[in-house]
């Protein structure tokens, strides 16, 4: 049965896992790491870079590198320009997903077509649909979108499903924060409530350090560095490193030599100490925001901290001591430590993929919608149909009527949010139901139905009960992608994949050619009288032809000239191999061995060189 991936598409890092032998296993990327930086860039030669390679070149190439694109998912008009071309957040996210997919395929040795992808619990409809679009562009059928804290609870509780317990999942990632309250028991994972902030995460803690460094440098040197992209990239890396170091030590030093040049032409260096106490002071308001969300989630679930059986921390930012201390003080419980905060979400997604694929039995996941859904009614009021923290999938209907006599049509304005005034909530979509027969206001009966699927994505319909006329909309949201746009982006992504494949193939052809030239030159040198002058002349001519081809860009020409060189050198290498064999067979004792030592080892080396094994590895 085809494998279904579980993917944690993170703000800072992403992770992919799969079910193998009844267990969820994290798949390492091509570089050998278990997580992949969610960074996309283009090199100065126009080559697409994703992951660690993109992150490494960011300091020298900040204009063509993008971080934290997840923070802009679902934004209508947001674009980033890389290598002279505009990309939507969905397209950038698709590049990350393509990298994860390709690495998983290489690891598993099979083609992957389906995935379960996680999103922050507090992602709205627009952001969820954008995530599905990104999966489609990457060539993945997204079977399910699930919430990150819920996925983490699956990772924690798959082997504890028979124990009734209430757990709090505190998920502080690179760019988003969620807290969810769940009840586990009898194989059922039921989300009772969720709260959070889609623009609060480790990036914000880093930014506080960056702001501090900028202010300190301006104070000491009188230079404003805030407009220099290359410098800001160095500061970003230094701030992230300092944050991580302060999780283990009480103070750290930020030393960045040759950061800029002063008005006197002299280089300026940064050398600033930062203590854990200073760091915690400058970020305490960020932690306070997470406390507000924890209180709200418990209140919505009608629980107190004393009712909790377990507290789970998820996301790399939860390694900060201040986070652990805050959660422990609030809940009165030491957080559960036997779970990797960077991998738990991907593992949970893989378990859900196993449920959908029939590999994992007796597990039922009951998630909730994070925000209230409703429509605008008379006077600009937001009238809710589905309250936040309602278990999904769900379907709710309500009867509305006209606001004026003989009103021929009604506009259904679909909203998401907690405010009582329509304009203060997020618009998900609008559509018109027309053809209503003339009647006094309040007489026509318009049934509005909201239907949320298991991915948390909304479908809305309106029906005139008098005429039976109906209109419906699958919320595509502002900034959503039409099927045609997704199709175009899929083709564009496939085209880039083909370009990447060709570029890689061309590099391999060049590497093979250069390695063969080295091996052939050594073979000629070592052959001695085993090669005729005519044979040597042919090999030398083939070497020159191949070197000339390497000066150009015609890969097929290089390939053909490589094959020609292989053919010309083959008789010589064969003769050398046979000579080496004969010498080995003739060695009958110490004297015989001494007589062949001078030539035998050399011939062995030449033969190995001709196979080009070592040279290819070096390339």
From Swiss-Prot:
The keyword DNA-binding does not apply. The keyword Transport does not apply. InterPro entries: ATPase_NBD, Chaperone_DnaK, Heat_shock_70_CS, HSP70_C_sf, HSP70_peptide-bd_sf, Hsp_70_fam. Disulfide bonds: none annotated. Signal peptide: none annotated. It comes from the Archaea. The gene is dnaK. Residues 580-619 are annotated as: Disordered. This is Chaperone protein DnaK.
């Amino acid at each position: 049965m085809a494998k279904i991936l579980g993917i944690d598409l993170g703000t800072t890092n992403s992770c992919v896992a799969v079910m193998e032998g009844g267990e969820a296993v994290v798949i390492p990327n091509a570089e050998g790491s278990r997580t992949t930086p969610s960074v996309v860039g283009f090199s100065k030669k126009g080559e697409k870079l994703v992951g660690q390679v993109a992150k490494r070149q960011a300091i020298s190439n900040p204009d063509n590198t993008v971080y934290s694109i997840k923070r802009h998912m679902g934004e209508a008009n947001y674009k980033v320009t890389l290598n002279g071309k505009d990309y939507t957040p969905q397209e950038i996210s698709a590049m990350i997903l393509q990298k994860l997919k390709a690495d998983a395929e290489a690891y598993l040795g099979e083609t992957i077509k389906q995935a379960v992808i996680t999103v922050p619990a507090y992602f709205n409809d627009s952001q969820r649909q954008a995530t599905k679009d990104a999966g489609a562009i990457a060539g993945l059928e997204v079977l399910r979108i699930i919430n990150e804290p819920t996925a983490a609870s699956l990772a924690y509780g798959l082997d504890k499903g028979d124990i009734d317990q209430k757990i709090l999942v505190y998920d502080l990632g690179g760019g988003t924060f969620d807290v969810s309250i769940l009840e586990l028991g009898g194989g059922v994972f039921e989300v009772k409530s969720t709260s959070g902030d889609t623009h609060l995460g480790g990036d914000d803690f880093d930014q506080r350090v960056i702001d501090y460094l900028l202010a300190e440098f301006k104070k000491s040197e009188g230079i404003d560095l805030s407009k220099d992209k290359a410098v800001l990239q160095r500061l970003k890396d230094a701030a992230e490193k300092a944050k991580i170091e302060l999780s283990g030590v009480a103070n750290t030093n930020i030393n960045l030599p040759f950061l800029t040049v002063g008005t006197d032409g002299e280089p300026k260096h940064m050398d600033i100490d930062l203590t854990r106490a200073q760091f915690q002071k400058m970020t305490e308001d960020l932690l306070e925001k997470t406390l507000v969300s924890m209180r709200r989630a418990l209140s919505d679930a009608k629980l107190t901290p004393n009712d909790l059986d377990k507290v789970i921390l998820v996301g790399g930012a939860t390694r900060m001591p201040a986070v652990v201390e805050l959660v422990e003080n609030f809940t009165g419980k030491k957080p559960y430590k036997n779970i990797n905060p960077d991998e738990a979400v991907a593992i949970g997604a893989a378990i859900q993929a196993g449920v959908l694929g029939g590999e994992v039995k007796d597990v039922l996941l009951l998630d909730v919608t994070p925000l209230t859904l409703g429509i605008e009614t008379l006077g600009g009021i937001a009238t809710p149909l589905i309250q936040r923290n309602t278990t999904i999938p769900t379907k709710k209907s309500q009867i509305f009527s006209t606001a004026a006599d003989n009103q021929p049509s009604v506009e259904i304005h679909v909203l998401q949010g907690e405010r009582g005034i329509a304009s203060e909530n997020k618009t998900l979509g609008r559509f018109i139901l027309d053809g209503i027969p003339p009647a006094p206001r309040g007489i026509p009966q318009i049934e509005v139905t909201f239907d949320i699927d298991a991915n948390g994505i909304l479908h809305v319909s309106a029906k005139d009960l008098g005429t039976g006329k109906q209109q419906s909309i699958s919320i595509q949201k502002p900034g959503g992608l039409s099927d045609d746009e997704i199709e175009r982006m899929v083709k564009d992504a496939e085209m880039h994949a083909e370009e990447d494949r060709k570029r890689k193939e061309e590099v391999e052809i060049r590497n093979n050619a250069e390695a063969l030239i080295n091996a052939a030159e050594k073979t000629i040198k070592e052959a001695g009288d085993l090669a005729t002058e005519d044979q040597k002349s042919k090999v030398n001519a083939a070497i020159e032809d191949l070197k000339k081809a390497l000066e150009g860009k015609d890969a097929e020409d290089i390939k053909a000239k490589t094959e020609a060189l292989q053919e010309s050198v083959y008789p010589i290498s064969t003769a050398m191999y046979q000579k080496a064999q004969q010498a080995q067979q003739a060695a009958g004792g110490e004297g015989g061995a001494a007589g062949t030592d001078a030539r035998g080892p050399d011939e062995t080396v030449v033969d190995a060189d001709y196979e080009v094994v070592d040279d290819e590895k070096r390339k």
